[in-house]
Amino acid sequence: MKRVASRRLLAAVVLTACSSFLPLSAVHAETPEKPRIALVMKSLANEFFLTMEDGAKAYQKEHADRFELVSNGIKDETDTSSQIRIVEQMIVSGVDALVIAPADSKALVPVVKKALDAGIVVVNIDNRFDPQVLQAKKIGVPFVGPDNRKGARLVGEYLAKRLKVGDEVGIIEGVSTTTNAQQRTAGFKDAMDAAGMKIVSLQSGNWEIEKGNAVASAMLNEHPDLKALLAGNDSMALGAVSAVRAAGRAGQVKVVGYDNIQAIKPMLKDGRVLATADQFAAKQAVFGIQTALKLLAGQTPEHEKDGVVETPVELVTAP
């Protein structure tokens, strides 16, 4: 791989420049010919991304002869500037490919263009870059991930069967500038509108437990007839469950989420959470890494259509 070898030389030249950057978790290769792939995630305070990282590391360990892995993430879901700095660090260090779950669908595009201009293969996972912004920058980045709208619609349809026409519901959205938050909200709306429910509130919970709790509490306070809370991820659903309990309305207000993290499973079992969607966190980064390896080898990813490699998403309910 001439491309990989040339990038090794660049990495050696700039190695000393990296000491002041954020700490990295790395799995080192035995030979310099193997490509180095950087996995850049969103908040590692979110169980979903820790599971994603664990899955990627396990895959690298099983395929240590094929590539090196460098992984990192940010402290909270809205720390876009830190994620930009991490990508800049990866460019300077001379990685061969970047697999990224962007904290913002638009703000990360300029630094991704820098990576592409530096000859780095870029693969987008989890949260899709805004296609219009990519087009404006005249770049293309493949997206490897699930249909978030479809997944949220499945959850919403399951909930709707347990409500009555005209029931009031609230939607707790993720970070509003992210495509996956927008798509999940759209899927929830699809299901609620089709079933004749009344969406009385839509607010952002920033993907986080505390913010999700605050938003859910406000909705419950403002809308005493609220029958359900649809959370764009399980972290916010955890916050919503606490808010429902604190309001003395356990069993009266249904809660659904998205991601199927470990912390939500006991709540599915005892009914505190009605349903969630599994987009297979442990495999998501792996799907992206597999795509990056194919692109580095000059191959076309399987099942790619219009720049998208769709991965599974499934409804999960009480066992």
Swiss-Prot record:
Keywords: Periplasm, Signal, Sugar transport, Transport
Principal location listed in the UniProt entry: periplasm
Cellular component annotations (GO), alphabetically ordered: outer membrane-bounded periplasmic space
Signal peptide span: 1-29
InterPro entries: Peripla_BP_I (IPR028082), SBP_2_dom (IPR025997)
Gene Ontology terms, MF aspect: monosaccharide binding
Coiled coil: none
CDD domains on file: PBP1_ABC_sugar_binding-like
Gene3D superfamilies found in the cross-reference section: 3.40.50.2300
Compartments where located: Periplasm
One record GO biological process: transmembrane transport
Family: Belongs to the bacterial solute-binding protein 2 family.
Function recorded in the entry: Binds specifically both D-ribose and D-allose, with affinities in the lower micromolar range.
Record-given protein name: D-ribose/D-allose-binding protein
Protein source organism: Pseudomonas aeruginosa (strain ATCC 15692 / DSM 22644 / CIP 104116 / JCM 14847 / LMG 12228 / 1C / PRS 101 / PAO1)
Species lineage: Bacteria, Pseudomonadati, Pseudomonadota, Gammaproteobacteria, Pseudomonadales
Gene for this chain: rbsB
